[in-house]
Amino acid sequence: MRRSNVVPVHSLTSSTNTGRDSRGEKYDELTPVATRRASISPDEARYLTQLASRDNAVSRVSTVADISLDDPALNPENKDFDLYKWLRKVVHVLNEEGVPRKEASIFFQHLRVSGTGAALQLQKTVADIITAPFRRETWNFRNKTSKTILHDFNGMLHSGELLIVLGRPGSGCSTFLKTLSGELHGLNVDEKTVLHYSGIPQSTMIKEFKGEVVYNQEVDKHFPHLTVGQTLEFAAAVRTPSKRLGGMSRNEYAQMMTKVVMAVFGLSHTYNTKVGNDTVRGVPGGERKRVSIAEMALAGAPLAAWDNSTRGLDSATALKFVESLRLAADLNSSAHAVAIYQASQAIYDLFDKAVVLYEGRQIYFGPASKAKAFFERQGWFCPPRQTTGDFLTSVTNPIERQARPGMESQVPRTAAEFEAYWLESEEYKELQREMAAFQGETSSQGNEKLLEFQQRKRLAQASHTRPKSPYLLSIPMQIKLNTKRAYQRVWNERTSTMTTFIGNTILALIVGSVFYGTPTATAGFYAKGATLFYAVLLNALTAMTEINSLYSQRPIVEKHASFAFYHPATEAIAGVVSDIPVKFLMAIAFNIILYFLSGLRREPSQFFIYFLITFIIMFVMSAVFRTMAAITRTVSQAMTLAGVLILMLVIYTGFVVPVNYMHPWFKWIHYLNPIFYAFEILIANEFHGREFTCSQFIPVYPNLPGDSFVCSSRGAVAGRRTVSGDAYIEASYSYSYSHVWRNFGILIAFLIGFMVIYFVATELNSATTSSAEVLVFRRGHEPAHLKNGHEPGADEEAGAGKTVVSSSAEENKQDQGITSIPPQQDIFTWRDVVYDIEIKGEPRRLLDHVSGWVKPGTLTALMGVSGAGKTTLLDVLAHRTTMGVITGDMFVNGKPLDSSFQRKTGYVQQQDLHLETATVRESLRFSAMLRQPASVSKEEKYAYVEEVIKMLNMEDFAEAVVGVPGEGLNVEQRKLLTIGVELAAKPKLLLFLDEPTSGLDSQSSWAICNFLRKLADAGQAILCTIHQPSAILFEQFDQLLFLARGGKTVYFGPIGENSQTLLKYFESHGPRRCGDQENPAEYMLEVVNAGTNPRGENWFDLWKASKEAAGVQAEIDRIHESKRGEAESKDSTNPKDREHEEFAMPFFKQLPIVTVRVFQQYWRLPMYIAAKMMLGICAGLFIGFSFFKADTSLQGMQNVIFSVFMLCAIFSSLVQQIIPLFITQRALYEVRERPSKTYSWKAFMIANIIVEIPYQILMGILVFGCYYYAVNGVQSSDRQGLVLLFCIQFFIYASTFADFVIAALPDAETAGAIVTLQFSMALTFNGVMQTPEALPGFWIFMYRVSPFTYWVGGMAATQLHGRAVKCSAAETAIFNPPSGLTCQEYMADYMAVAPGHLSNPNATSSCEFCSLSVADQYLASVNIYWSERWRNFGIFWAYVVFDIAVAVMLYYCFRVKKWNFSFGKRKKSKAA
């Protein structure tokens, strides 16, 4: 469809005649639908259907009243469904019901927007942490540097208009759209700015009508496990108006709108398919983009901003999308501002207005049809066949723009000069007159528009909704819909839920069996306490995993809040509600098994109290961790807080350190600890009202009379053979049963309090801030033009700060670099390539007998509709697939591919994956060092890297750090680096490129394709996928391979001059002729998208039967014959070298290079290293001062052991800090570096293991200093040295254990679950919580296998050996000896065989007996001996070595050989 075929709405309103449409039906004076019917495709009509169904009217239609509502043509699910009739019927009904039209305009004057940031940033390193206190900027507490992003914009957009926003990446397009739509988080609008919507100030609009102005982000954000149908039905439901068509219910309306909008965007077949994301399999990327568009369309906003929403869509689909917006604006009076980086002429012609941005300055705003003439008058030349959009963008590119002859000295050069020219132009003056008139009109209307908006909103709002609320639904209705969606997510993710359920069951079985058979006597006191401690702790701490899940969904909730779908707090409430049954199941699985297996109190009331408290504490701690996620900005902040909190909660529960032994500086923590109150309830519930038989008396003599004996347990009374449970818990924990229901009330108060904080924080902290883009440089390597404070672009003509590959001003320099590319002679061919995979047990063919070749010196384009298999074919040809079955032939010079094929090819992936901490030059050097042959010297490789930098014109940012988008290279610079990394490798065979122009503006796309053309002319063989080529860009290619859906070849062969060869082939099979000014690429996509030619013949079948297809096969045969002879003669003359080896460099040279890079990366991750060190220091200090100066009592001795135990408790946090970084490294290696055969997997694994060790050693030293002296004071030097060695060893083990766990696993979540399980088992079986003698016989092997058994034993023996024990009053057993005997005489026989000592041996009453004399006596009872300390030290090293060996083995088996976790080998792809 072309803009010229569309009759403007205003032209229809001037006539009062009645005519007939193409169907012979009458239409009246206001029927734009009928007028446009001939040019509306079915998909477009469906989009109109959706829009017309909203609470507005297109026009007054009275001639369709006689169509029955039961007519099949009005049923979207009926095969006879007639969208045209349905649309007219809907419009008629809406008009009869008096639903008002949604109209709004945008007016902005002197719009100036700033953000935080500076021209450049310096990369932070570990050295910066050390030197920070000595640098001046550290102590500068003033506000962050403000950077102006948009300078003085003026304009207005009326209802029914489309505005195209043009500018290069970084020019401010996204900021402009965000500002118009009120997405101002992190942005500051100047107070002099005037910005209103039909007279309504922006502040009022955002507060009361947020859903009327919406912004579509460039990135797709959805709940991945929801289906497309569920996602869109939810969007329809939350924006369902109160007044609906034909008395439909809310559910009926939402379902109808969902079905219609899915048909509009071609998504009907995906109704039950998960949306998916980068890690969850779902719909393809192009369809996911359409889901985003459909979701925002269902918002029904009259004002919409679309930020590069055509990214990832082919040109035909992109055109249809913009045509839909055009029709929506005309028929529904909506207004749309659209930023498009690659706009075809057909797309551009659909817009009413255009705005051009140049480095944040407005250099044109006005009619789109006059923009080209404006810049030509300014003095710029528009080349033939260049689209208007490309031309307008090109004038902002100093390298690409061309002045008209004679105008070179008169045209503006800098952004400020362009802006000055615009402000002096007649077009600007005309705009000012229009704006003045509009301002006068809106001023005269007063509050009419505001009242109109409010009235329209009230008609749409549900009852009980606050009038000033921007939402259509009441809070209870929002909670209901969010809860329904939450349950859908739980059900769709049931595999994860079941995994957690099974894990909890296994953990309960393990812990329960460890304490199985605990006696109901005093010997079981400690075990019962430990059981309940585990019960409350494991129930409480499972909620920590919710932090990650909340952060993963936060961007989605933010987006929905911006659409005015619901309050973020209502989603938080729904999440808690949906958790109730899940947590209930988890509680049943864990608590019932643990309770009865461990032999806790078998009474109904006690069991139900136990279950109630453990269930409540799950929700209390869930609220605590959710609150942490809500009040923080990053997941690392939340996890750091959680790690410290867990330590505090565990130590101050009252079990590890009883209340009476808590030091005053930290004692307050237990009052704020919910687990403390829960633990007291469980202990009191278990022990209250019970008398426990004494297991051991002091002394153990037969027939003891009166009070001459006492039970060895705390709370015992002399002369009694039982011990009161209440007395025991009072003496041991200072607990009382009277506190049970008080504590329950406190837990409920904690639950309510934290839930309220969580809901409020979620509502208030639900927006991500924006900041200005900035380059990051290494300290001391800043470019001079930025170091001196100048903004990039101050000298555009010199290319300062510019990143485009030169094609004119820098051409000579670039050509000199390209000539250094070695000439190529090899030809890559493939024949009848077929690729089959299984999806849900069903076979699916992705490639169907594809044949072709790539010759040196040729540039071949690979094109096709979305989902045709372009990237799949590249992956198959490059041998990068890891599943499915491949058949067919692939040859180089007629010979089968060898192991060196992948390293001899370059593969530029669509995703720009690079090491964030490296600079551009370092990234290129790393590629050159490892991928160029070992025979080439380091100096030569580095020299070639400099040539690549010149070729790609990257000198200005060669020392810039890759970073992340916003703080680092921009999209264009990243793409250039991706290409540069492959060029630095000097690929000998060919270069694959997958969508190298995706996300780039037209000028950057042209520059990159022009550069590829030059590479091809220099002898490089190139195969490149591309989906939105302009006519000029398309002409750069020599050959085309075009695929239809299903990977079926439609054409392979030369494109020809002006695409004549290609067009001749297609036109010979019946479709319409391609117009002279039409883009051949768009013509071809349109023709093939139809599926068949006008005669009904399938394009794939036509190709197979064509003489061109036969010619392809004959040419492949000819290539094979001619090249085989050449290859044989070469092989006979060339000596053997590494030519056919898998890697260019041998392993012993790879390892140092990779290790240095990883060391460099760690040095440049100060936040990671600081977080690691702070965790160690804080944990060490906290543990040290919690067990400060452990005294000589029994509890003091236990405190030392528990301090060692608590050091073990930070193990899980340490490991989970390391795992995400390893995954980041592994993702880069496995996605880009390993497929390119850059270096061996062995070098990757060993380097990552080595680099962690120095930091772990430093951490061990710091923790030793913080912990050891606080607990033990100064002991002998040999003990200090050994404890230091144990600390260092512990942290080294943590890093190797992390590598061991994550080596084979796919993600951090799975690894985290396994770490938690293994860590829990290691702690359970290390002999502290349950002595070896008390363990059931089955589990004694776990005591011996647990690494912490040896570490805790070594640490405890070293610290406690030889320490005298002096019992405290509570620990002393007091009894009276028989008359006439002293305590010493009475106890002599007993003390001859039992440990312990008397405090008053000569007393004749109240004997005070301490059950131990020295700590070694207790240590021996738990199988810890001073003599075995060095043995334990050596055994723990064996675990370190074991972890390293198994990590390497697991990586090889599961990540290299691709075994699955069913212990079978995955079916590998194979080429016949």
From Swiss-Prot:
First and last residue of the signal peptide: none
Pfam assignment, any one: ABC2_membrane
Compositionally biased spans, kind Basic and acidic residues: 784-793
Superkingdom of the organism of origin: Eukaryota
Domain ABC transporter: 134-384, 828-1070
List of residues binding ATP: G864, V865, S866, G867, A868, G869, K870, T871
Glycosylation sites per record: N143, N277, N308, N332, N1402, N1460
Membrane topology type: Multi-pass membrane protein
InterPro entries the UniProt entry points to: AAA+_ATPase, ABC2_TM, ABC_trans_N, ABC_transporter-like_ATP-bd, ABCG_dom, ABCG_PDR_2, P-loop_NTPase, PDR_CDR_ABC
Main location: membrane
A single MF term (Gene Ontology): ABC-type transporter activity
Disulfide bridges in this chain: none
Gene Ontology CC annotations of this record: plasma membrane
Disruption phenotype: Exhibits enhanced susceptibility to itraconazole, however voriconazole susceptibility is less affected.
Region (Disordered): 1-28, 784-821
Subcellular location, record wording: Cell membrane
Keywords annotated in UniProt: ATP-binding, Cell membrane, Glycoprotein, Membrane, Nucleotide-binding, Repeat, Transmembrane, Transmembrane helix, Transport
CDD domains: ABCG_PDR_domain2 (cd03232)
Polar residues bias (residue ranges): 804-821
Family recorded in the similarity comment: Belongs to the ABC transporter superfamily. ABCG family. PDR (TC 3.A.1.205) subfamily.
Protein name per UniProt: ABC multidrug transporter atrI
